[in-house]
A protein has these predicted regions:
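Expand to "…catalyze enediolate/carbanion chemistry for C-C bond making/breaking, isomerization
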Residues: 1-289, 293, 299-320
Length: 320
């Protein structure tokens, strides 16, 4: 399983709901997003762009990232959104590109933002049959593309499927495999039943076990459960501590921990897990990355990510 604090959860706030901006930043979501797309009626798009600028000027928690979902780039509003964003005083950390169907969508967004937003990165929302088919190419669209987001509602309507986990399992698996193959993150679609926390727990657990990094929330009450599901429990953290301790003791040579053979990839993944989720362990010193030997997985693309952003892959006790 992969764990990261980069995108366990995302909470969307309509651009017109200015009174909710502050709460969004303080919600506990890893990504606080203002929405210019579905939640804004066509007649108020320009007003929404003006209001959304204030979303990025508000104080946020040190771990939260700010994001904006633009309109689809197949119409004029998407480009208008990007032109407006490029002029914002404070730039967003992330731009979500909806209805992504080819790498060209990411290229257009990067070109429109230009030199005005050099640090802004992208998440591509894959939510059409063509987007699912082209997901591998979209995921590899460039170093500013940080992940794929599965959009279940639009995809379901497009193919005529049921909005259920079983019916959409193939599409979800393709999104995850495409993202992981390119070394980027994968976020699952929302669970739309706001009051059904048991259903959310089940679906979030399935998404985690599928390989997703996190899940979109449609209501703040979903965030705590989503963050918990996509974070390691104490048992996994304790195992990571034992793996790191064994690596320090053996000089990071191959050894056995809890009956499982572990080597360099295990040491590095356990180290990252502790650095991200167990900050009370200052006694575990950061270790430099050592290039892997042939046949041994190395750090994926995304090793340029800031400290604490890269995913952490920890095998379970039963894995060999």
């Amino acid at each position: 399983m992969k764990f990261t604090r980069y995108c366990r959860s995302l909470l969307s706030t309509p651009a017109m709901a200015v009174e909710r901006y502050t709460k969004s930043h303080q919600s506990g979501a890893d990504i606080a997003m203002v929405d210019l797309e579905d939640s804004v009626p066509p007649a108020r798009k320009e007003e929404a762009r003006r209001l959304a600028e204030e979303f990025f000027a508000l104080p946020s928690t040190k771990l939260a990232r700010s994001a904006v979902r633009i309109n689809t780039l197949s119409g004029p509003d998407g480009l208008r959104d990007l032109i407006a964003i490029a002029r914002y005083r404070v730039k967003p950390d992330l731009v979500l590109i909806p209805m992504a169907e080819s790498p060209r969508d990411i290229e257009i967004a990067a070109g429109a933002l230009g030199a005005d937003c050099p640090e802004t990165e992208f998440l591509a929302v894959v939510e059409t049959p063509l987007g699912i088919e082209h997901a591998p190419a979209i995921a590899a669209a460039g170093h500013r593309l940080r992940g794929l987001v599965f959009g279940s509602a639009d995809y379901t309507f497009a193919v005529g499927a049921r909005l259920s986990w079983e019916a959409l399992a193939h599409a979800r698996a393709r999104v995850v495999n495409s993202a992981r193959g390119a070394g980027v993150e994968a976020m699952d679609a929302p669970f739309f039943e706001v009051t059904d926390l048991a259903g959310l727990r089940r679906e979030a657990g399935l998404a985690r076990d599928f390989g997703f990094s996190g899940k979109i929330a449609v209501h703040p009450r979903q965030l705590a459960l989503i963050n918990e599901t996509f974070s390691p429990d104490e048992e996994l953290l304790e195992r990571a501590r034992r793996v790191v301790a064994a690596g320090l003791e053996t000089g990071r040579s191959v050894t056995v921990v809890d009956g499982v053979m572990v080597g360099m990839p295990f040491f590095e993944a356990s180290q990252r897990l502790i650095e991200q989720f167990d900050p009370a362990r200052p006694d575990v010193p950061p270790q430099p990355h050592v290039p892997s030997q042939p046949g041994v997985p190395s750090q994926p693309r995304g090793s340029h990510h800031p400290q604490g952003d890269s995913p952490t892959d920890i095998p379970t006790m039963t894995e060999k």
